Design a protein with these regions (language model features):
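Periplasmic-binding protein-like
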Residues: 106, 122-124, 148-162, 187-196, 233-259, 272-294, ...
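A ligand-binding cleft/hinge motif common to bilobed small-molecule-binding domains
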Residues: 84-86, 221-238
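A bilobed periplasmic-binding-protein/Venus flytrap-type ligand-binding module shared by bacterial periplasmic
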Residues: 125-132, 167-169, 250-264, 271, ...
Length: 341
């Protein structure tokens, strides 16, 4: 749906809403541009009021300082899943009034939270260059198979994601990954599997590096954020994604505790969570809708690049927020020592 038509449709949802200034905070970049086109402009055209977009880098401390000082100037903030859980526990966010947002049954289960609404799904996946690798890898076992697929592998320098991928490569079913990794033997098994691949690993730390490695021919496969591969494809690069065993996570909309524009903030969250708005967003960046009804409004080409499409999500693993909150510090310390050897 074009923004102008989306705006017209929203007039029903925002019938007599006073003009107000709403401050919406996100991470900027291509995601921020997609939100501006799909959400901000449509909201303003529908009479919802003026939106001021602010970029940040996920600094929870800024939200905490506002809330504790009772001087809240941010109305809606995009947060990552660990910050959602921590901020909710600390009382930094308003409770979400789902009766004003939408039908919970329409959303992915992970998108429904007492303090937030999942706004998009992103995934860490396996990627390769279709011009350089004619036989497509189909699972993490292929990523580890340097005889069948000779060459370097790009991997994010950290324990997170890599330990999960290692266990899947070693035959652990997706549904059992965190159950196995939570044990001493399971962690040992994951590090042992990583050690097998270590001579062939080229580490990356910035999200822009994996597609650069592929295009330059430095690696034959790499882990990558799906949105980065999508951006390279839009630039004409023939990069491909293997979705099997990808690890997905969500970003969420929250309202800082004490926002003076709570009603307007709820209306914005409801609009940006609607099927039409989320479908428009997904056309501009390949992050998946959390409202399942949005998928019916997208063509096959767009669906094929989304983590939330049925074909791409059927063998995916949801990022274990609780697991990494409990064991992340120890595993990252162990990984750093292992990587330095």
């Amino acid at each position: 749906m074009k923004p102008v038509f989306l705006a017209a449709a929203m007039m029903v949802a925002l019938p007599v809403m006073a003009q107000s200034q709403l401050t919406v905070v996100n991470f900027g970049g291509a995601n921020g541009a997609a939100q501006k086109k799909a959400y901000f402009e449509a909201y303003e055209k529908a009479g919802g009021g003026k939106i001021t977009a602010v970029e940040y880098n996920g600094e929870q401390a800024k939200i905490k300082a506002m809330v504790e000082a009772k001087k809240v100037t941010w109305d809606v903030v995009e947060v990552e899943s660990p910050d959602l859980s921590r901020g909710c526990d600390e009382g930094l966010f308003e409770k979400m009034d789902w009766a004003k947002v939408g039908n919970k049954a329409d959303f992915q289960k992970a998108a429904v939270h007492e303090c937030g609404v999942g706004t998009f799904v992103w995934s860490t996946v396996m990627a390769y260059d279709g011009d350089k690798l004619k036989t497509a890898p189909t699972a993490w076992a292929d990523f580890w198979d340097v005889k069948k697929f000779p060459g370097k592998r790009g991997m994010r320098k950290g324990a997170r994601y890599n330990l999960e991928f290692a266990l899947m490569a070693d035959g652990v079913k997706t549904a059992d990954v965190y159950k196995v990794l939570a044990t001493k033997d399971g962690a040992e098994r994951a590090f042992k599997k990583l050690t097998e691949l270590k001579p062939n690993i080229q580490w990356w730390e910035a999200g822009a590096q994996p597609p650069q490695f592929l295009v330059a021919g430095d690696v034959v496969m790499t882990t990558a954020y799906n949105g980065r591969i999508d951006a390279a494809q839009r630039e004409g690069k023939n990069l491909k994604i293997t979705w099997t065993g990808g690890i997905y996570d969500l970003d969420y909309w929250v309202m800082p505790k004490g926002t003076p524009n709570k009603d307007a903030a709820l209306k914005f969250i409801a609009m940006s969570s609607s099927p039409d708005a989320q479908a428009e967003y997904a056309k501009n960046i390949s992050y998946g809708p959390t409202n399942n009804k949005a998928l019916t409004k997208l063509d096959a080409k767009v669906l094929g690049m989304l983590p939330t499409s049925p074909a791409n999500s059927k063998d995916a693993l949801q990022f274990g927020i609780g697991f990494w909150a409990d064991q992340g510090e120890a595993l990252e310390k162990r990984f750093s020592a292992w990587a330095a050897q």
